[in-house]
Design a protein with these regions (language model features):
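Flexible interdomain linker/hinge and immediately adjacent N-terminus
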Residues: 1-30, 82
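A short, glycine-centered helix-capping/turn motif at helix boundaries
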Residues: 53-63, 159-161, 172
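Conserved tyrosine-mediated DNA breakage-rejoining catalytic core shared by Y-recombinases
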Residues: 57, 62, 66-99, 186
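Short, basic (Lys/Arg/His-rich) helix/loop patches that form interaction surfaces
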Residues: 33-40, 130-168
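Short, leucine-enriched amphipathic alpha-helices that occur as contiguous helical runs
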Residues: 21, 43-48, 122, 126, ...
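Catalytic-site neighborhood detector that most strongly recognizes the C-terminal catalytic loop/helix
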Residues: 84-85, 170-188
């Protein structure tokens, strides 16, 4: 047996189960698709894209909101460059998401915000997360950027990604923080 098959997440770590994450993603997508005016379409596209970046990268909210959309994405390698506290790290993202994100950024609506696309009020993004979470039955404490970060970490660990790689992807300076996600029982 591999360690990733045995570990349990510490009780104090809030994260989403796969079906909760799927519901959260669906709620954001439905909300985006329900936009009618050009202004609303753009606002919702921006917030949905930020949500997806949080979901797929495990980055901190501040890291995503400070991205320079002109240089952050590497379409050829399906990567996003995230400036962390001490360095820039390259985080892989799903190819189809990278393509969709760069298409939005290159669209007429996205071009008008070049260099500023991700600069939104963090409180507004959090409130939008709470609202989408409520729509899919998530309690407020599970519908936020921190929980998306934790969820991504748990997802990677459960898929057998080594702890050191998870630490690097999340931009953690020590293994202690990421190690808190893994707990093994004495029988393990």
């Amino acid at each position: 047996l591999s360690p990733h098959e045995l570990f349990n997440v510490a009780e104090d770590v809030r994260y989403l189960a796969p079906e909760q994450l799927s519901g959260f993603e669906d709620a954001f997508k439905s909300w985006q698709d329900a936009a009618r005016s050009n202004k609303s379409v753009l606002a919702r596209q921006r917030l949905h894209l930020i949500f997806q970046l949080l979901r797929h990268t495990g980055a901190r909210l501040g890291e995503i909101l400070s991205l320079d959309d002109r240089t952050a994405f590497d379409r050829d390698r399906s990567m996003v460059r995230i400036k962390g506290r001490n360095a820039v790290r390259e985080v892989p993202i799903p190819e189809e998401f990278c393509e969709a994100a760069t298409n939005v950024l290159d669209s007429p609506m996205g071009c008008g915000l070049r260099g500023e696309f991700f600069k939104v009020d963090p409180g507004y993004l959090r409130r939008t997360c709470y609202e989408r979470g409520r729509e899919c039955g998530l309690p407020k404490e599970l519908a936020n950027p921190r929980v998306l970060r934790n969820t991504r970490a748990v997802e990677m660990l459960r898929n057998g990604v080594p702890l050191a790689v998870v630490k690097e992807v999340l931009g953690q300076s020590s293994l202690d923080l990421a190690a808190g996600f893994q707990q093994f029982t004495s029988q393990d």
